[in-house]
């Protein structure tokens, strides 16, 4: 089933694609859609089956958010992408993450699918939080990125480098979090790190030692 998804992010204005200039590596490359069955399988591979088997699955096609599968446990999964060719970011959210953080994720993917520059994406996200159209979590919100099929880049910007299947990890959303709150000296500490320090989208990233299919991590990986 493919249904348009009227989430709050669709109320935000589209960011301009101006400034999305081609880089030497081919960036920006608009995401290539996958068949629905492939998209669903890839999305749910982000989390253990206990969560993902009953999760709602979304996809973004040409700026439109579609519901590929209706779930029953309040959680949600999607394959996020940026404008690096081949990027695949399977991610699943628990119920509170699906209620709040997912809207920001889909907004970013939606704008990138239309060719928006990263500066435009960041402005749209900031405006969404400032206006209240994007909500911060009221209780524990988390995401799973445990898919062995992930193809990550170190940054969504043109200078981002391909990392591939980096490391299975969990993300806990703590608006305004800073490394010092956790006794950390920097954002990229190991095995716990903080991304987006001090912002409404701050998240605590925790590495785990197995992929969602139970395969152990073979070699310790460095933070991208």
Model-found features: residue ranges?
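Primary mode marks residue(s) on the alpha4-beta5-alpha5 output face of response regulator receiver
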Residues: 22-224
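Bacterial N-terminal signal peptides that target proteins for export
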Residues: 1-7
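N-terminal signal peptide c-region/cleavage motif recognized by signal peptidases
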Residues: 13-17
